């Protein structure tokens, strides 16, 4: 998947028709979607329409993000997939659910995702 993502920035895939509408939901993205949907965090059925859920978030983000601050023409489904993975990591830290690969220091002065 990472190879395909990298090839997207070459002549081979720069004109791919599904750049904005497809991304592979990895384990972190699936857990992030599960958190948002209130599903069991371990739910990971491959036949589930993960891409449809990510596309819905992509559409919502395009409606709500300020185009004067973010170049939305470069905002792809890959950003949604990566954002969901990061959301899951930060949620695990906040909820003290196991360990993460990297160490993050919590700062109570920074806003939580719920406050943004």
Predicted feature locations:
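C-terminal accessory module of base-excision DNA glycosylases/AP lyases that mediates lesion recognition
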Residues: 4-116
